[in-house]
From Swiss-Prot:
Name of the protein in its database record: 3-methyl-2-oxobutanoate hydroxymethyltransferase
Keywords: Cytoplasm, Magnesium, Metal-binding, Pantothenate biosynthesis, Transferase
One Pfam family per UniProt: Pantoate_transf
Species this protein is from: Chlorobium chlorochromatii (strain CaD3)
Subunit structure, interactors included: Homodecamer; pentamer of dimers.
């Protein structure tokens, strides 16, 4: 049952993340898609929970993040927010704006960002892109909705890239990424995710901004790090990118438990008299 009477700790805000950057305190961020995991991660002290459009991959089995809808994202976000609320209430909750929920126009972007914020008590939205979305970011932040940016490898643009290789290795793309980061900050973004870019470039971006950077495959110089929870738990045995640190092989553990359960049921070892009424 939820521990609604347990002491609450100070909720992580955009201001707190800025303070953490200034104080040299690293920011921890993980994805969360459901109530139970959100409670566990909040209790563990994770600073930011990202309701990622990666739910399209790890929950629905799609090969890309593109198919997930705004309604599906809101469903996951509501569960995560409830989980944080029923634990310490500390973690910030950020939700990805899914593909084509903000690309058509700044007006459409504002409408959908407002819909997301109104339907659950999340803290911010996250958007992929640089100069092409700056107008939308400014319009959204101007009405009081915090926006986290995302540069480098942008999964919603995977068909444009053609692969998940490291981005901004060439000088022209690296210079554009630097400009985009500065534009996002000026537009009002409170933080920027840097995905799969050279460590030296990530360090340069981090040093050039007053807002925090959160890396995924972008080196240790970023102000924080983010990973997909399923990846660090080893739930996907086919996915082992270089930037992921797998802390446990939960895939094998769950399979072992399930096999033992099947054996116990078939052998009439479960339920025992102690597990019956």
């Amino acid at each position: 049952m939820p521990h609604r009477d347990q002491p609450k700790t100070a909720h992580v805000t955009t201001r707190r993340l800025l303070d953490m950057k200034q104080q040299g305190e690293k920011i921890s961020m993980l994805t969360a898609y459901d109530y139970t995991m959100a409670r566990i991660l909040d209790r563990a002290g994770v600073d930011v929970l990202l309701v990622g459009d990666s739910a399209s991959n790890v929950f629905s089995g799609h090969s890309t993040t593109l198919p997930i809808t705004i309604e599906e994202m809101i469903y996951h976000a509501k569960a995560v927010v409830r989980g944080v609320h029923d634990e310490t209430g500390r973690a910030m909750v950020v939700i990805d704006m899914p593909f084509m929920s903000y690309q058509l126009s700044s007006e459409e972007a504002l409408r959908n960002a407002g819909k997301i914020m109104k339907e659950h008590e999340c803290d911010a939205v996250k958007m992929e892109g640089g100069h092409v979305i700056v107008e939308s970011v400014k319009r959204i932040t101007d009405v009081g909705i915090p926006v986290m940016g995302h540069l480098g490898l942008m999964p919603q643009s995977i068909y444009k890239y053609g692969s998940y290789r490291v981005r901004a290795q060439e000088e022209q793309e690296a210079e554009q990424l630097l400009r985009d980061a500065e534009l996002l900050e000026k537009a009002g973004a409170f933080a920027i995710v840097l995905e799969k870019i050279p460590s030296a470039l990530a360090a340069q971006v981090t040093a050039s901004l007053t807002i925090p950077t959160i890396g995924i495959g972008a080196g240790v110089a970023c102000d924080g790090q983010v990973l997909v929870i399923n990846d660090i738990l080893g739930l996907n045995r086919e996915f082992h990118p270089r930037f992921v640190r797998q802390y446990v092989d939960l895939n094998s553990m769950i399979e072992q438990v399930a096999r033992q359960y099947v054996t116990d049921v078939r052998g009439c070892d479960f339920p025992s008299s102690n597990e019956s009424y």
